[in-house]
Design a protein with these regions (language model features):
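A sequence-level detector for short glycine-anchored, His/Arg-bearing signature motifs
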Residues: 227-243
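C-terminal or late-domain output modules
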Residues: 183-196, 215, 219-224, 241, ...
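Short alpha-helix boundary/capping and kink motifs at helix termini
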Residues: 18-229, 248
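Solvent-exposed functional surfaces
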Residues: 1-55, 59, 237, 245-246, ...
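Residue-level signal for functionally critical sites in structured catalytic/ligand-binding pockets
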Residues: 129, 232-236, 298
C-alpha cells in the first residue's frame, strides 16, 4: 500500500507485507557470529565479510565483488519492454510505478532478499551541494559524487529519512573497504560488484540517462553496516555518474511496528500552551505561529500511528574460526594479506 503524508497527501513510500508463518532464510541473507563477525550470503556464496570495531568507530568490509548470474540476481535485468511501459512517467507516478515494479519482481525472483514480515520502500533524491563548496578530489567522477547529497522524499517524523552524504564509496572497487563511522562514511552506499565504463549495459544506460529515462537504483538497508548495499543498478549508477545524472535511489528495509504511547496529560499541556501562544499579543523578536506551523504541531500531537522500527535480520550461525579462515584464504588468493591483521584484530 502507498504511504501518504497526513499533512498534505504527499507520497512517502510503499509498505509491503510478505506473508508467511516462518522466516526461512531468503536467497540473499545475513549471517552473524561472535566478535561482531558478519557475512552476507547469496545462496551458499559469500558476497562480503564484515566486522565492527569494538567501540563502533567503523567497520571493515571484505568484498567478493562477484557479479550474480541471471538466475541468482535479486532483480533480473530490466529490459526494453519494461522501460517502454514506464516511459514518460514523472514525479509521483514514476516513483510509484518503479516501486511496484521492484517489489513485484522481488516477490517472484529466486535471488530475492524478501522474507516473511513487513518491508518498506522509500525513495531518496539527490540535492546539489552549494556551489561555494570546493571539490575535494581531482578525479572527475569523484567530483560529481561529491556534489550529490541524497535524502528521502517527503517529510514524516515516523518514517526513516535515508540520507547519503557521499556516494564516493561506490567507486572503491578494492577487495577491502574501511568505513569510518566518525567520518563521512555513515549511511554509505556499497557496491557488490565491479563495473567497467565500457560495459554494454553501462553504454545502454548512458543513452537512457540522456533521454531522462534512467530507472532508480535499488538498495537494501543493513543496520549492522550502517550502510545500504546495491541490489540492482550498479550499471545504472555508473551510467548516471558518467552522464552527470543523479539517479533516484529506492531503499528497501525490513521493519516492525511499535505502538505509539499516548500521554494525554502532556497533550493537554501542549494544547494549553498553543492556546496561550495564539491568543497572546505578539512580542518584539517573537514570530507569531502561522496556520501551517500550527497545523503541523497539531498533526504531530494527535498522530497515534504505530512507529516503524527498522530491522536487520541475521542468522547467528557463524563460528569465529570459520569466519577468520575464510577471510584469510580470500585475501591470500588476492595478495591482500597486508590488510588481514587489523581486520582480525578489529582495529583501524
Amino acid at each position: 500500500r502507498d504511504l501518504e503524508s497526513p499533512a498534505n497527501g504527499e507520497w512517502l513510500g510503499l509498505a509491503v507485507q510478505v506473508e508467511g508463518a516462518h522466516r526461512a532464510p531468503s536467497f540473499l541473507h545475513l549471517q552473524s557470529g561472535g566478535q561482531a563477525r558478519i557475512r552476507l550470503m547469496r545462496g551458499d556464496q559469500p558476497l562480503l565479510w564484515a566486522t565492527q570495531l569494538p567501540y563502533h568507530d567503523g567497520i571493515w568490509l571484505v568484498k567478493s565483488l562477484v557479479a550474480a548470474s541471471p538466475a541468482q540476481a535479486s532483480v533480473p535485468p530490466i529490459d526494453s519492454p519494461t522501460l517502454e511501459a514506464l516511459r514518460g512517467l514523472r514525479g509521483e507516478a514514476r516513483y510509484k510505478a518503479w516501486s511496484r515494479y521492484f517489489v513485484e519482481t522481488l516477490r517472484t525472483s529466486p535471488g530475492s532478499c524478501l522474507e516473511a514480515g513487513r518491508w518498506l520502500l522509500r525513495l531518496s533524491l539527490a540535492e546539489q551541494v552549494p556551489a561555494w563548496q570546493p571539490p575535494q578530489s581531482h578525479d572527475p567522477r569523484e567530483r560529481v559524487l561529491e556534489r550529490w547529497r541524497y535524502r528521502s522524499v517527503g517529510r514524516d517524523a515516523l518514517l526513516p529519512d535515508w540520507r547519503f552524504y557521499s556516494l564516493e564509496k561506490v567507486l572503491d572497487d578494492d577487495w577491502v573497504q574501511w568505513l569510518d563511522w566518525w567520518g563521512r562514511d555513515n549511511d554509505a552506499l556499497i557496491a557488490l560488484r565491479r563495473v567497467e565504463d565500457d560495459e554494454g549495459r553501462v553504454k545502454w544506460w548512458r543513452k537512457k540517462a540522456r533521454e531522462g529515462e534512467l530507472p532508480p537504483v535499488l538498495a537494501l538497508r543493513l543496520n549492522c553496516l550502517d550502510a545500504c548495499v546495491i541490489l540492482d543498478g550498479h550499471c545504472r549508477l555508473r551510467a548516471g555518474l558518467l552522464e552527470n545524472v543523479a539517479p533516484e535511489i529506492l531503499v528497501l528495509c525490513a521493519y516492525d511496528e511499535q505502538p505509539m504511547p499516548v500521554d494525554t496529560a502532556q497533550r493537554e499541556r501542549v494544547l494549553q500552551s498553543l492556546a496561550q501562544r495564539v491568543d497572546a499579543p505578539v512580542r518584539r523578536g517573537r514570530r507569531p505561529l502561522d496556520s501551517e506551523q500550527l497545523n503541523q504541531v497539531l498533526l504531530r500531537l494527535f498522530d497515534d500511528r504505530p512507529w516503524p522500527r527498522v530491522l536487520t535480520r541475521a542468522r547467528a550461525v557463524l563460528k569465529e574460526e570459520q569466519w577468520c579462515a575464510e577471510v584469510r584464504d580470500w585475501l591470500a588468493a588476492r595478495e591482500r594479506l597486508d590488510a588481514l591483521e587489523p581486520i582480525i584484530r578489529r582495529v583501524e
